[in-house]
Amino acid sequence: MRVLRACLSLCVLVVSDSKGSHELHQESGASNCGCLNGGKCVSYKYFSNIQRCSCPKKFQGEHCEIDTSQTCFEGNGHSYRGKANTNTGGRPCLPWNSATVLLNTYHAHRPDALQLGLGKHNYCRNPDNQRRPWCYVQVGLKQLVQECMVPNCSGGESHRPAYDGKNPFSTPEKVEFQCGQKALRPRFKIVGGKSTTIENQPWFAAIYRRHRGGSVTYVCGGSLISPCWVVSATHCFINYQQKEDYIVYLGRQTLHSSTHGEMKFEVEKLILHEDYSADSLAHHNDIALLKIRTDKGQCAQPSRSIQTICLPPVNGDAHFGASCEIVGFGKEDPSDYLYPEQLKMTVVKLVSHRECQQPHYYGSEVTTKMLCAADPQWKTDSCQGDSGGPLVCSTQGRLTLTGIVSWGRECAMKDKPGVYTRVSRFLTWIHTHVGGENGLAH
């Protein structure tokens, strides 16, 4: 385990009891213990090869990483190191070092476990910047990610208060879809592909494919445009067109583990654009629709982490040079073997058609049914795995689905911006298949 160097170089601690005294010496190589919060690395006089941390008052744990004085959490609780260890229903948390938890993304054996507060205990933590501290809880044969019974230090929130219209953890009696609305303000600045929370992109849909052996793999992103409909890219499904093969998650921000409040859907209809085509690089008419239902026949239910995105007005796209958000589980480099575990977001700027059709860009490959967008510094971009996901821009004062991640050469390559399906050119197609049902909003 990677350790933090937080010990002094030399000191002597003498501990006495009624039977005599035992000398404990701080080692000159004290950093080997990885003591935190003022803890001192000591060894027994006659067993110098046995080292441990001697913790100051209020701190416990192998590395003095547990703060017994913390009875509430600040912010989203990422720095919480207290001893709460039950979910909001009182179920005990599983130890982070238990054999079953080790199969999950966050556990005590990660190289960065100490920095994340994970260790040989079952205390609530928030290693992935979710809404509040959480833990794994055993429910039947399943391990579930559950929010914890620990209050916010602000004092305005227990684990489930009455709804006041402002508290992000409260539960209103009735929530309605309001397209383009999210709990967090738009972040129209370059963020370098940083991890984000699903509340920042609550319309994002994660699409997976089932395999014959029972395994499930991530395929593409999508966007919720009405309670029952997700829009994505046809090229994601062109090789496997059986709707029964696909699963859609809303409200999910981690690739292989559940997120509190997420919803799982089967695909009732899979509609690929009839004029889709692809050449050596470009994808044409690259748009698809998925009608979704839960196993109980329900469409999506609105929440802080599940919301629809507005469709753009006809011929009313954001102006070239505008900043837009992209989000997904895409690889940082096309040569990467694995997709990142955490949902990521970055910001790009729309590139004019005239510029994108220059020979050193893409030339005639780019049509008027496409949009180009890029980071001006060519440092961030959509990449493999982001396909089908949203390009969200502010249009006429509201957030709209301006584009769908479609194609491009490499990722963040100079003079090779990402190319997106131009949604405003497919509004008639969308309405033809969706009809007047299900609350499509512009």
From Swiss-Prot:
Residues 190-435 form the Peptidase S1 domain. GO terms for biological process: fibrinolysis; proteolysis; regulation of cell adhesion mediated by integrin. Residues 1-20 form the signal peptide. Its main location: secreted. Inhibited by SERPINA5. Inhibited by SERPINE1. GO terms for cellular component: extracellular space. It is found in: Secreted. The keyword Cytoplasm does not apply. Its EC number is 3.4.21.73. Glycans are attached at residue 152. Specifically cleaves the zymogen plasminogen to form the active enzyme plasmin. Found in high and low molecular mass forms. Each consists of two chains, A and B. The high molecular mass form contains a long chain A which is cleaved to yield a short chain A. Forms heterodimer with SERPINA5. Binds LRP1B; binding is followed by internalization and degradation. Interacts with MRC2. Interacts with PLAUR. In complex with SERPINE1, interacts with PLAUR/uPAR. Interacts with SORL1 and LRP1, either alone or in complex with SERPINE1; these interactions are abolished in the presence of LRPAP1/RAP. The ternary complex composed of PLAUR-PLAU-PAI1 also interacts with SORLA. This is Urokinase-type plasminogen activator. It comes from Sus scrofa.
